[in-house]
């Protein structure tokens, strides 16, 4: 059994496990918990009644957080020639082609998001086993396989995040930092919840979003009533 710190136990005592909170209430409760000497990350976690093994129930997409994540993403771009120059000018942190592909194949993973031009995907596809499990594989559906590398890089730097349901039907989102105002965290949470609801597969009958939680790096999760997200 994991031994929790005194601060964690104190925070956990504030959460009524017989109650489901609104997002506003959950965020306010989270911010009232004991503080730490660093700016904690705040996350939202959803449980969906989907079967990710079925292609038509693999919920994935992107969402632009109105207040960003509180973290500037390190963006890697696979491109060559003028598009490589364009990516660098747009603010990409790492840009390259064949040599960079080899570097990633060799274990280099110091980046948070990946963009590729379509002509690079034949070779980038070899990185599926490296990037896929980490949710980093470029995909046209999420705007990360594109000729408009400027827009892709600026969107990611501006707070655009990519998500994909895991094998257990869970979705996790970074929605900001504990230093954010409650209203900013609430608006970021609403943005991700609205996008998840919009992507409900037509083959899913009955309740789709079955559980929601807001949590932070060092504190327990606060359960949010899914009915308040309708």
UniProtKB/Swiss-Prot annotation:
It comes from Bifidobacterium longum (strain NCC 2705). GO terms for biological process: regulation of translation; translation. Keywords: Repressor, Ribonucleoprotein, Ribosomal protein, RNA-binding, rRNA-binding, Translation regulation, tRNA-binding. Binds directly to 23S rRNA. The L1 stalk is quite mobile in the ribosome, and is involved in E site tRNA release. Belongs to the universal ribosomal protein uL1 family. Pfam families: Ribosomal_L1. GO terms for molecular function: rRNA binding; structural constituent of ribosome; tRNA binding. GO terms for cellular component: large ribosomal subunit. This is Large ribosomal subunit protein uL1. It comes from the Bacteria. The gene is rplA. Part of the 50S ribosomal subunit. PROSITE patterns: RIBOSOMAL_L1. Disulfide bonds: none annotated. InterPro entries: Ribosom_uL1_bac-type (IPR005878), Ribosomal_uL1 (IPR002143), Ribosomal_uL1-like (IPR023674), Ribosomal_uL1/biogenesis (IPR028364), Ribosomal_uL1_3-a/b-sand (IPR016095), Ribosomal_uL1_CS (IPR023673). CDD domains: Ribosomal_L1. Signal peptide: none annotated.
């Amino acid at each position: 059994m994991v031994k929790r710190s005194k601060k964690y136990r104190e925070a956990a005592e504030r959460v009524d496990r017989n109650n489901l909170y609104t997002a506003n209430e959950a965020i306010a409760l989270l911010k009232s918990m004991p503080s730490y000497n660093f700016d904690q990350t705040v996350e939202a976690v959803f449980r969906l009644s989907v079967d990710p093994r079925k292609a038509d129930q693999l919920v994935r997409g992107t969402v632009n957080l109105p207040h960003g994540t509180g973290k500037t993403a390190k963006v890697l771009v696979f491109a060559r020639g003028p598009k490589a120059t364009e990516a660098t000018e747009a603010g990409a942190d790492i840009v390259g082609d064949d040599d960079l592909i080899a570097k990633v194949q060799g274990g280099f993973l110091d980046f948070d998001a990946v963009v590729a031009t379509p002509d690079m995907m034949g070779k980038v596809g070899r990185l599926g086993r490296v990037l896929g499990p980490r949710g980093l594989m470029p995909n046209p559906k999420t705007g990360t396989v594109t000729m408009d590398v400027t827009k892709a890089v600026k969107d990611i730097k501006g707070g655009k995040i990519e998500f994909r349901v895991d094998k257990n039907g869970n979705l996790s989102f970074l929605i900001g930092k504990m230093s954010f105002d409650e209203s900013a965290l609430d608006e970021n949470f609403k943005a991700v919840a609205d996008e998840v609801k919009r992507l409900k597969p037509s083959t899913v009958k009955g309740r789709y979003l079955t559980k929601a939680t807001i949590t932070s790096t060092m504190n327990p999760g606060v359960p949010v009533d899914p009915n308040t997200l309708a």
